[in-house]
């Protein structure tokens, strides 16, 4: 069968996408193979499969394919985390509506349709990338079969006392008009003004948020601050307001910030919440859910926060209370979605209890890769100041399965058998357990999207009737440790009392070629389709493999190009191999025919197998692909294949069979080594010389019979000798296949095989085990004109002629002693050896030779 010379990645990929069957990757609960269950991240269906997705899923696919080839029954599911604000915004934009303009169920229907379209686009890209996903295990969180389980988890945690409703300060996004969790706050660096404001003559505070002055409920100083501790207990009037507050002491006040005097507002930040709780202060909330100040702000009521800031500063100036303003660097808490500065306001919300110590103890029982990523979770958990707020003021999300009795206000949470349920559309089938009323108001708040995605390991294992648990692996990015990883551990403990996975592998983010975060405004965004269109999927997958797990990775076109070139190289190796083994069937007898070079490369190849297996087991895909490529290109193609070509073309039948055995074996092993990383190329190569799919084969294991230290030494020596002779020919301007008179090789290794040295150098070869006596004589002394010319000027030529006429013995004495006396126009002149370059000739046993030294041998080229 004729095989084209150039590897066409697009043609190959298109071919196998049509031929591969989904059933190849279906997970069977009844399989007797050991199970390996991957809790894959369900992406948000934006419709665009970005480069970060490509990286994440490549890593997952490397693991899934590797584990399958090692005899595991692998579950690689695909989910879609659908609910959330971005879809609501896109639907509002698409249809030119606001969510309140149409019935809730109609708005949700539009969101579902929009999301289904996006899922279809992303599903197509995932298939195009060759990911070995079990599509029979696909889940979509917006469908009742999934969100009914989210609701079930809510009910069970509520019944365990782990979910409760309370009036408490929460983080609120005025633009999105919903609460968000602490983990969803993004801090953005910027510039702001630190305002120095006089409350009383001796009370001056410094604040970045003057608009919250009407919410000031106390002034605080550090108890040991010599400048300000005399103020403790003093009553102070709050400027621009009718309020009076007390100065209190607290150790958490930073005496070095501003004036060392701070105002406590309800609420400027999380520190205010801590102080409010600790000192049992008054609650005066002045910011509404729309981001405007309310009636408690007095004359500033109805203003937006920026408007109130300007108005209050203007009033302070008029009253002479604004002493100065200083520009400072400032971190502002913003909404993770819309980047609007968030506010902390008190509200009646649903919360999940966060049991910090239990979560951290469980997290320690999980293997973290890299290990240091655990500390990120630990730092986040320790920094949490209140429980997880799970209610959101949106529509497109899992409904909270609860009602409120209109008669007595009793909260009625759904029973398990009522699920799934939308409380805004359905009344509970039973009367109020407290007063017997049948009049209810359905909960209009919905659940945080993380309530859906934090039960993914439970869902894929059949919860609530678990078939197996925990899962084996959670692969995810470091950017969602404090959300997805944290919430999943919390929920798994709450619902099943177990860790969700045995191991968690954390990958990094993808940055542009300029080393910065990808952004349309920076013009450094790369999409997977662009890479695939130019160089194919496997080249992109090799790039993904080049990143170190846990580290951020820079997208670099040169890495993709190098990957593409390697594929062409491997394809050329495959073509060369198939050309020679088309009529060959390996046999055990052929092993007896192996020569030094054969045993060398087989030993090196098996050591490569051991090295790659170790790297793959440790998720060091970067080291694995590097080792495979280095061996394949340099050891195997550039050296072994070049060494045995003469044997393949001109050798005896036995010599050919030995080489063909190696070619067949090496192509088999290398193709299987590459299969998890370059599935298309591996399948195409495999199909030309083996039956079935390479992805249904076993991953290579080290075959001890081929490990041979003596052969490795011999092979390295042969490689060095051939390389030295080739360089000699190149330097002499000879063709690489030009014959040489004879090579005499001194080697300390007993029985070094000369067949392949002779064939690769096109020369007669003699091996000697004792170093020959090398005689060296001066053939010529080349003058260094740059030295002699300036020293002797018009007599330089005479000096050079005089030295040239010296006898061989005199020339050798000059080199040995460093200087001799020479007669120059009747005068004795000292001539130094350093003025000349000695050209010598070597000989052994009377034969003139060129001597080439390698690391392990000496080669004499007879001339």
Curated annotation (Swiss-Prot):
Keywords: Aminoacyl-tRNA synthetase, ATP-binding, Cytoplasm, Ligase, Nucleotide-binding, Protein biosynthesis. ATP binds at residue 520. Gene3D superfamilies: HUPs, Isoleucyl-tRNA Synthetase, Domain 1. Its main location: cytoplasm. The keyword Methyltransferase does not apply. Its EC number is 6.1.1.9. The keyword ATP-binding applies. One of its GO terms (cellular component) is cytosol. It catalyses: tRNA(Val) + L-valine + ATP = L-valyl-tRNA(Val) + AMP + diphosphate. GO terms for biological process: valyl-tRNA aminoacylation. GO terms for molecular function: aminoacyl-tRNA deacylase activity; ATP binding; valine-tRNA ligase activity. It is found in: Cytoplasm. A motif ('HIGH' region) lies at residues 43-53. A motif ('KMSKS' region) lies at residues 517-521. HAMAP family: Val_tRNA_synth_type2. Catalyzes the attachment of valine to tRNA(Val). As ValRS can inadvertently accommodate and process structurally similar amino acids such as threonine, to avoid such errors, it has a 'posttransfer' editing activity that hydrolyzes mischarged Thr-tRNA(Val) in a tRNA-dependent manner. Belongs to the class-I aminoacyl-tRNA synthetase family. ValS type 2 subfamily. ValRS has two distinct active sites: one for aminoacylation and one for editing. The misactivated threonine is translocated from the active site to the editing site. This is Valine--tRNA ligase. It comes from Archaeoglobus fulgidus (strain ATCC 49558 / DSM 4304 / JCM 9628 / NBRC 100126 / VC-16).
